[in-house]
Amino acid sequence: MFYKLAQKVMFQMDPEKAHHFALNSLMATANTPLDCFYAQKIAPSPVEFMGVTFPNPVGLAAGMDKDGECIDGFHAMGFGHIEVGTVTPRPQPGNDLPRLFRLKPAKGIINRMGFNNKGVDNLIANLKAAKSGALIGVNIGKNKDTPVEQGKDDYLICMDKVYEYAAYIAVNISSPNTPGLRSLQYGDLLDDLLGSLKAKQKDLAQKHGKYVPIALKIAPDLSDEEIQKIADSLIKNQFDGAIATNTTLSRDGVSGLMNANETGGLSGKPLNLLSTSVIKKLSSCLNGQIPIIGVGGINSAADAIDKLDAGASMVQIYSGFIYQGPKLIKDIIEACRVRK
């Protein structure tokens, strides 16, 4: 009930202002008696994934809490893990405003944020300050002004800095809002990046005395052949996991709606079927050798179960969480418990 009232207010606001209002509210109320308005008691439903035991199979997808400012608030809602970022080596403002648009009739969102974040050093300070003990995935990317050919260096810088604070590291090469980024999903550039990250992981595991798994986040706008090549590269380079999928450039199911023609990646309910189909194909190509986090368009517990049935081991939510509220977390966990 409280969330529906809050949503009604926030949906009257500009989407990005509403986003900042929500984050500021969480920062102000986390670890205080006021967190009773959104905190949920959820019985553990542990999942083993990439060698890490997660308290439940539902995570917060990257992009909601880019700078890790609200970890304790989101943890109180019951998320089994929180993926912060995408973070880059240096702070950057992202793309020009406006850059975030609701497609309310379709329960969709279009964004062209452009990896706006306060930089990896600021993120680390926030990770150190968090009190909840939440499992944190750190989603890393490259700065906009770093040439694609040198993008690998940005990923290695971020990986080096976040390694000791992360439960896992997500490598984002699939945002449509950073020029040239998606080219890293193909051929020699992909193999070179994954091989370099795997070598860095080995060095950091020795340095810190712990193994932090790495996962690759992929786009939904891929051909069957491209999915196969990505799977082959993941297996060849012994990556620990895959995250499928990011936002789509497709406008299927939203044409004619207000804001549908805005440039950027489409998320939310219109992405659901496309994302699930990519998960199914990727799972087949990986043949059980590498586990998958399913994300993209989950708007109900049934949507989450579809992703698990397609081959995912865990799920993440973001746009569906905005439209449905914290109850969606609990609904999915309960459905997963029944599915077992």
UniProtKB/Swiss-Prot annotation:
Subcellular location field: Cell membrane
The keyword Oxidoreductase is assigned to this record: yes
Active site: 175 (nucleophile)
Gene Ontology terms: biological process: 'de novo' pyrimidine nucleobase biosynthetic process; 'de novo' UMP biosynthetic process
Named cofactor requirement(s): FMN
Positions annotated to bind substrate: 66, 111-115, 172, 177, 246-247
MF annotations from Gene Ontology: dihydroorotate dehydrogenase (quinone) activity
Keyword Flavoprotein: yes
EC number: 1.3.5.2
Record keywords: Cell membrane, Flavoprotein, FMN, Membrane, Oxidoreductase, Pyrimidine biosynthesis
InterPro entries: Aldolase_TIM, DHO_dehydrogenase, Dihydroorotate_DH_1_2, Dihydroorotate_DH_2, Dihydroorotate_DH_cat, Dihydroorotate_DH_CS
Record note on cofactor: Binds 1 FMN per subunit.
Entries under SUPFAM superfamilies matching the protein: FMN-linked oxidoreductases (SSF51395)
Taxonomy, superkingdom: Bacteria
Membrane topology type: Peripheral membrane protein
Protein's name in the database: Dihydroorotate dehydrogenase (quinone)
Organism: Shewanella woodyi (strain ATCC 51908 / MS32)
